[in-house]
Amino acid sequence: MEKKIAVTAGTFDLLHPGHFNTLNFAKKHADELVVIIARDETVKKIKGRSPVIPEEQRKIMIETLKPVDRAVLGSLNDKLEPILEIRPDVIILGPDQTTYQINELKSQLAEHFLYPEVLKVEEYVKCPFHSSYDILKEIVRRWCCKELKV
């Protein structure tokens, strides 16, 4: 019997509870979890800024987490490339993905005769520092203005 493979993807720059929630959710839906780490160049294009932590370090951090079986760097040319190579049974998307994005992904994969189940983590983890942005804001609040007199 073949292992059921799940894939999820993200920047995973400053780890927070939302990341762990997504990874645990993904692992519950498969025997093997592969995480695609967004490339520094891709993050800069999409978010307008480079990640704090370089891609190779983010990959190492993610692949050492308990639910993760393997981490790979995303493609610089085609976001579907690693998915087409892995050929997962399940793709897990974060709570910030829209129905349009999900349907678009399914359509693009179908063009390559790949029909994985696409699941979405439905709820955000509600706690302090549930996003990388919140962590950065708190670091600035605590350190930059007081310690550096900025």
Swiss-Prot record:
Gene3D superfamilies referenced in this protein's UniProt entry, alphabetically: HUPs
Keyword line: ATP-binding, FAD, Flavoprotein, FMN, Nucleotide-binding, Nucleotidyltransferase, Transferase
Highest taxon of the lineage: Archaea
Top-level EC class as recorded in UniProt: transferase
Annotated residues for binding of ATP: 11-12, 16-19, 96, 124
Any GO molecular function: ATP binding
EC identifiers of the protein: 2.7.7.2
Pathway info: Cofactor biosynthesis; FAD biosynthesis; FAD from FMN: step 1/1
SUPFAM superfamilies: Nucleotidylyl transferase (SSF52374)
Recorded catalytic activity of this chain's protein: FMN + ATP + H(+) = FAD + diphosphate
Single Gene Ontology BP annotation: FAD biosynthetic process
Pfam family, one: CTP_transf_like
Cofactor: a divalent metal cation
Protein family per UniProt: Belongs to the archaeal FAD synthase family.
Self-association and partners: Homodimer.
Protein name from the UniProt record: FAD synthase
Organism, as annotated: Methanococcus maripaludis (strain C6 / ATCC BAA-1332)
